[in-house]
Design a protein with these regions (language model features):
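Alpha-helical multipass membrane-protein architecture
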Residues: 2-777
Length: 777
């Protein structure tokens, strides 16, 4: 019988342990990553993790003996020889091409979940902390909704000629379920491109033409076609009833609880015990406060400050991230502040803004003038009066860390993954052909993450694949779309720099994708892109508007941000026997649906929270800070308006360039230690992740990391190692429920309280002076 119709469960078993169970639905991204050539045996696991697991598929039908009909495969035979064991034991090797994929039901549910996901994700951009929209929730919710539609919709054929379709083609299929997950993930990522119209409105009083903003967003997002398939088998088994009940209970409890830290009782969002014992002592308050301080021993009961990364990140990654936090926030910040180092206290160490030499706010708008050709230049006379754009110590060494992270990704991959990459590439080159699947035009990346899967390639051949010309067309559409917008001077960047943005974005794709593949940790490339852009626009006649730098950063970054997901999820679609054209079509549809929603939410937040997110007032909760937008504006001022040539001529900024050297030396040291002491597992200490985590800005809110490492140690160290079956059964479903409950609460508060101007009265747990009761500020 077709494998899609089998009710199955996945038994996830670590190479050295026993039988934890997990649904393939929630395993799909991990399955794709675990097939990669470089696998670590770090004892933590998550959909974004890097642990090697043996996934074994057992029959799980609790109501019949359907498992007797399961085909038995001889995995020792030649036809399976080139298929990795982890893939052999998870995916099905039979396919029913008659199962419906794109139907009225899947389109309707995809549109609903895309709208919800894009709304929540866009709201999160304006907050200091947030929990990602969990696609796992979509998978859980779409199955019963799909079955409901299959029962209630009429079997009516909508007469549209060759495009006629049925409202109800029969039972809800696993392929419909999977395609909904693809669309929801593509549409719920949020749109980084909305940062451009947001910053234009917040800092320059410019309202971008909505059409330009939308087409710029579509072009940027379609550069890589981001999507993820989260499906292998449906949640049909009766044994799932208990887990689903627990999921909804946790979701509801989280939804109710979040009213306390987010609205009614914000005191619990940042418990600062040091402040309780010396609430009027400035030094103690700085050390203990999670808002504006370094959050030493600070505990949070707000899930947005924790998120499900305590479950989805491997434990080694969590430790690396926490070490980066400790070094920068608990050590370097106090040293700089109390030692009056790196510009402290003249430049606020807890700010990511820009300052004049005397510490006053930098008047960046007064430095910009536009010539008759519509090109923005620097008013050099005014610049001589204002001087260099300085930044606080924390933001300055953030640049250092990002430079180190960027270089480290290349060196790390060369040292730790280089031999494996070369071996696989030579083997595939010797074969004389590449996969006959949808990745055949990306052979380098395909060979890094997928071995020859002959039988699966045969199964997918029944579906028309994307031809070379179709790939070219799908690539040219967003490229031309963006080129027109850039050439018409709608995004303030010189046209020729657009092509450089594509080139540098492509160069970063390989090492950054590999780091993500083995860790689940996404590395930013923005600061390096800004440096390159800053030097390029030193050319005479180039626009120097800070928003041009942001447009360049968005375009260049999206090249690899989207490509990494395409690489991963093309494999998943391959494993699930999904028609390539259907997958592409749903991706495009998800982007078309999501972007107008993103734009509308962006305008709504600016309208209702403008004073907070623009920095004119301080949000009492410390959440609606818009700190990311401020960081991008600071970077635009320093790299585009002032320029790196002037910036790094200053002794204040010159040490930042040593970040490149640190990024090259650190992975080499770790590699040598790993070669000398392989049993110590120095290879788990990924320097790229360390530098990236150390570059995180904690000026507005430092509560969270301490609580997160405590919970992460409990989940991904103690439970994973010593209560593995319990962990595997409940960890992911709990994380998804907690994230979903938080996001539902966030959406409710914004729609029904935030937009209406409803303000919580002040009381002991919502003190007007300090919700943490740190009164020395």
């Amino acid at each position: 019988m077709p494998s899609e119709h089998r009710r199955s469960r996945v038994r996830v078993q670590e190479s050295m342990s026993h039988e934890p169970e997990k649904d393939v639905l929630s395993e799909a991204p991990a399955i794709a990553r675990h097939a990669d050539p470089y696998i670590s045996d770090d004892p933590a696991f998550g959909p974004e993790g890097k642990i090697l697991f043996d996934l074994k598929v057992d029959a799980a039908d609790t109501s019949d003996n359907s498992s007797r009909d399961e085909p038995q495969y001889d995995f020792d035979s030649e036809e399976f020889a080139n298929i990795p064991e982890i893939i052999r034991e998870v995916v099905g090797f039979e396919d029913d091409p008659t199962l419906p994929v794109i139907t009225f039901r899947s389109l309707l549910l995809s549109a609903i979940f895309c709208t919800i996901g894009s709304t929540v994700s866009q709201l999160s951009y304006f907050r200091t902390t947030y929990a990602p929209f969990p696609v796992f929730f979509v998978i859980l919710a779409s199955a019963p909704l799909g079955r409901l539609l299959a029962r209630v919709l009429p079997a009516y054929i909508v007469p549209l000629g060759r495009f006629s379709f049925s409202l109800n083609p029969g039972p809800f299929s696993i392929k419909e379920h999977a395609i909904i997950g693809i669309a929801a993930n593509a549409g719920s990522q949020g749109q980084w491109a909305t940062y451009l119209p947001t910053n234009a409105a917040l800092y320059y009083g410019i309202t971008m033409n909505p059409a330009v903003a939308l087409f710029f967003g579509w072009g940027a997002s379609l550069l890589g076609f981001s999507f993820a398939a989260m499906g292998k088998s449906e949640l049909h088994a009766k044994r799932e009833a208990k887990r689903m009940k627990v999921f909804w209970l946790i979701l509801f409890a989280t939804f109710v609880w979040q009213f306390l830290p987010e609205y009614l009782f914000p005191f619990v969002a940042s418990l600062a015990p040091l402040c309780w014992f010396a609430s009027r002592n400035h030094t103690v308050n700085f050390l203990g406060a999670g808002r504006g301080g370094i959050g030493l021993l600070n505990i949070t009961l707000d899930w947005s400050n924790i998120t499900s990364t305590v479950i989805t990140y491997p434990y080694s990654v969590q430790v690396t991230v926490f070490v980066g936090f400790v070094i920068t926030t608990w050590i370097l910040i106090p040293v700089a502040k109390f030692g009056n180092l790196w510009g402290s206290p003249t430049y606020n160490i807890m700010s990511n803004g820009v300052f004049q030499k005397n510490g006053s706010s930098y008047p960046f708008t007064s430095l910009i003038y536009t010539d008759l050709n519509g090109i923005q230049h620097v008013n050099e006379t005014r610049y001589e009066e204002v001087g260099l754009a300085y930044s606080g110590a924390q933001y300055t060494w953030e640049i250092f860390m990002w430079y180190a992270s960027y270089i480290s990704s290349f060196v790390w991959c060369a040292l730790f993954l280089g031999p494996k990459i070369a071996k696989i590439w030579k083997a595939r080159k010797a074969q004389g052909h590449y996969h006959k699947d949808r990745l055949r035009y990306a052979p380098i990346l395909a060979c890094l993450t997928m071995k020859e899967i002959d039988l699966l390639s045969v199964l997918i051949q029944k579906y028309p694949g994307m031809t070379l010309w179709e790939w070219v067309a799908l690539t040219l559409v967003p490229i031309v779309m963006l080129l027109v917008i850039v050439a018409l001077k709608k995004v303030w960047m010189p046209t020729w720099t657009y092509f450089v943005a594509l080139g540098f974005g492509g160069a970063a794709m390989l090492p950054m994708s590999l780091v993500y593949a083995v860790s689940g940790y996404s590395i930013k490339v923005g600061f390096f892109n800004e440096l390159i852009y800053g030097y390029m626009i030193e050319a005479k006649g180039s626009s120097r508007h800070p928003l041009g730098q942001l447009a360049y950063r968005i375009i260049s970054g999206n090249v690899w941000y989207d490509a990494r997901v395409v690489l991963e999820d093309q494999k998943i679609g391959h494993y699930l026997h999904l028609p390539p054209r259907d997958v592409m079509g749903m991706q495009i549809l998800a982007n078309i649906i999501a972007l107008p929603v993103n734009y509308g939410v962006m305008r709504a937040v600016i309208s209702s929270k403008y004073e907070y997110v623009s920095g004119q007032k301080v949000d009492p909760s410390g959440q609606w800070t818009g700190q990311d937008f401020k960081s991008y504006n600071t970077a635009g001022i320093q790299y585009a308006l002032v320029g790196p040539k002037k910036l790094f001529a200053s002794s204040f900024f010159k040490p930042v360039l040593y970040g490149f050297a640190a990024g090259g030396i650190a992975p080499l040291v770790i590699w040598l230690l790993h070669k000398k002491f392989p049993k110590v597992r120095f290879d788990l200490w990924n320097t790229t992740i360390f530098f990236a985590s150390a570059a995180t800005f904690y000026g507005n809110l430092s509560t969270g990391p301490f609580t997160a490492i405590l919970i992460g140690t409990f989940f991904n160290f103690y439970l994973y190692r010593y209560r593995h079956k319990f962990w595997n059964k409940w960890a992911y479903i709990s994380g998804a429920a907690l994230d979903t409950g938080f996001n539902a609460n966030l959406l409710f508060i914004f729609l029904f309280l935030g937009t209406t101007g409803a303000v919580m009265v002040n009381w002991w747990g919502n003190n007007a002076e300090s919700i943490e009761r740190c009164f020395a500020w």
